[in-house]
Amino acid sequence: MTTLAIDIGGTKLAAALIGADGQIRDRRELPTPASQTPEALRDALSALVSPLQAHAQRVAIASTGIIRDGSLLALNPHNLGGLLHFPLVKTLEQLTNLPTIAINDAQAAAWAEYQALEGDVTEMVFITVSTGVGGGVVSGGKLLTGPGGLAGHIGHTLADPHGPVCGCGRTGCVEAIASGRGIAAAAQGELAGADARTIFTRAGQGDEQAQWLIHRSARTLARLIADIKATTDCQCVVVGGSVGLAEGYLALVETYLAQEPAAFHVDLLAAHYRHDAGLLGAALLAQGEKL
C-alpha cells in the first residue's frame, strides 16, 4: 500500500509517495505560507498533494505543533505565520478522499530514526533543531505521544529564566535561544535581520558574533540533552533539523555536553534519514500504529 506522506514545517511543506518498502518517490516541496489564515495553508496543501493523491491509498501527516484529535494546535504560532489552529485530518480527507492520520513532525521523525538504530536500543530521544526545537521520545520501544499530544515538546523547557520570551508564552525556552529563529532574533549590528543560514555562513568566514550565536545555541542544546539524560536515562540522542545537521554544529554540541558531569553524557547521533525523517515516520506509523 502506498502512503502519501506530508511534512508540515515552519519553513517548508513537503510531500512524497512512500511504498511499503519505505522507498521515497515523487518528493515535492513548497514554502510554508506565512499567513494567519487557514485558507492559505489549505490552498498550499492542495497544490502540493494534487499531483500525488491518485497514486496513494492513504495519507499520513507529520506536522509542527501539538496534534490533538486530528487538528494542529500551534504551541508557538510564530512558527506558522501566526496560525493557531488547523483541522489537518479533516482537510486532507476532503482534499484527497483518502483515510488520513496526523502526528507531530518530531514524534514522527523520532519513530523513523528509532527504526534505523542498530543494536538493542529501547530508550531513545530525537531532537530537531530547525525553525523551532522539537523532539520525540521512544521508551520501552514505543513512541510516546501523550494523551494530549504534548510529549516530546522539549524545546519549550526552560533554558534561561532571564532569556527571551518564546512564542509559546514562556520566558527563556530552549527554542527561543537554540532554534534557527532564536539564533536570528539575537543577531545585532551588521547581522541584524540575517537568517540562521546566513549566520552559519558568516561564522564559517570567521565572524565573531555569528560564532558566538551558534555556540550559544549548541551550549543550550547540550544542557537540554543533559537534562533529557537525567529525565529519561536514554541510550542515545539523535539530532536532526536544518540547524542540527548544519556543518560542525553537532560537534559543538558534543564539546559542550562533554563539559557536563559524566552521569549526564549520552551518545549523540546525526539523523540517519536527515530531512526525510518526518515523512518516513508518518508513513511507518500509518502502517499500523494507533495514534
UniProtKB/Swiss-Prot annotation:
EC number(s) recorded for this UniProt protein: 2.7.1.60
UniProt binding sites for Zn(2+): H156, C166, C168, C173
Biological process according to GO: N-acetylneuraminate catabolic process
Pathway in which this enzyme or protein is active: Amino-sugar metabolism; N-acetylneuraminate degradation; D-fructose 6-phosphate from N-acetylneuraminate: step 2/5
Entries under PROSITE patterns matching the protein: ROK
Keyword hit for Nucleotide-binding: yes
InterPro entries: ATPase_NBD (IPR043129), ManNAc_kinase_bac (IPR023945), ROK (IPR000600), ROK_cs (IPR049874)
GO MF term set: ATP binding; N-acylmannosamine kinase activity; zinc ion binding
Superkingdom of this protein's organism: Bacteria
Function comment: Catalyzes the phosphorylation of N-acetylmannosamine (ManNAc) to ManNAc-6-P.
Subunit relationships: Homodimer.
Family, similarity comment: Belongs to the ROK (NagC/XylR) family. NanK subfamily.
NCBIfam families noted in UniProt: NactlManKinNanK, PRK05082.1
PANTHER family to which the protein is assigned, alphabetical: N-ACETYLMANNOSAMINE KINASE (PTHR18964:SF169), ROK (REPRESSOR, ORF, KINASE) FAMILY (PTHR18964)
Protein name: N-acetylmannosamine kinase
